[in-house]
Amino acid sequence: MKISKNEEEIYQYMRIHQFHTLFSFHVLPYVELHSFQTKEMICSEGNALPYLYYLISGRAKIYMSHKNGKVSLINFIQAPSFIGELGLIGVENITKSVEVLEDCVCLALPLKDCQQLLLQDATFLQHLCKFIGEKTITRTENYAKNYSYPFENRLAAFILLTEQNNCYIEKHTEASEYLNVSYRHLLYVLNRFCQQNYLRKEGRTYYIQDRNTLEKLADELKI
């Protein structure tokens, strides 16, 4: 992780992404710029997150571990998005892991300096309520799609969502659980995608060969 406190640089990012409009107080003195590379952890499970993050570029995934050793893939984050908002308002006591899929840049607000300002800012809370509501709707729609569309369409969308530099490398156990299919069926369809030249497998990595077809399959899920 790289941290910048350069006010001129931060101001430019704030202006481009209209970050200042989310607050009624002068937020610039508190903001830091945090950059994360692929595979870095924005947040590790169980560790308190000392910042409220606003993701302005990049992608990340959220997952959690269980007492039996299994790991569950929960959701994906794409810009623009808050990270750590549930901890801020006190409804999530144990943080989940957030891992970078594609280099991420975040505007960061240190909670030790401005948590009370945030919780007392009606403008910010209105924006936060809208964000949480939209996120809830998206998760509900994704859950419904898992039971309403053929697996080929859902897998194509999942591959495009998680691919890194044209490579798909997600663990089969996590992917099958997230997509609500058996491990065996996941492997069967991945193999069929390779036979149809949508993908090419080398070792444990799948390389995207026919992005257009995958995009057409994934587009069926769009509402």
Question: What is each PLM-predicted segment?
Answer:
Residues 1-38, 83, 87-88:
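Cyclic nucleotide-binding regulatory module and flanking cytosolic helices
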Residues 32, 41, 59-64, 82, ...:
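Short beta-strand segments in beta-sandwich/barrel cores
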Residues 37-38, 56-57, 78, 102:
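A cytosolic small-molecule/anion-sensing beta-strand core signal
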Residues 42-47:
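Short phosphate-coordinating micro-motif centered on Lys-Gly-acidic
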Residues 50-62, 79-80:
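Glycine- and acidic-residue-biased ligand/ion/polar-headgroup-sensing regions
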Residues 73-130:
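Cyclic-nucleotide recognition modules
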Residues 101, 118-184:
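Polybasic "coupling" helices that flank or enter modular domains
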Residues 149, 158-223:
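Phosphate-/nucleic-acid-contacting segments
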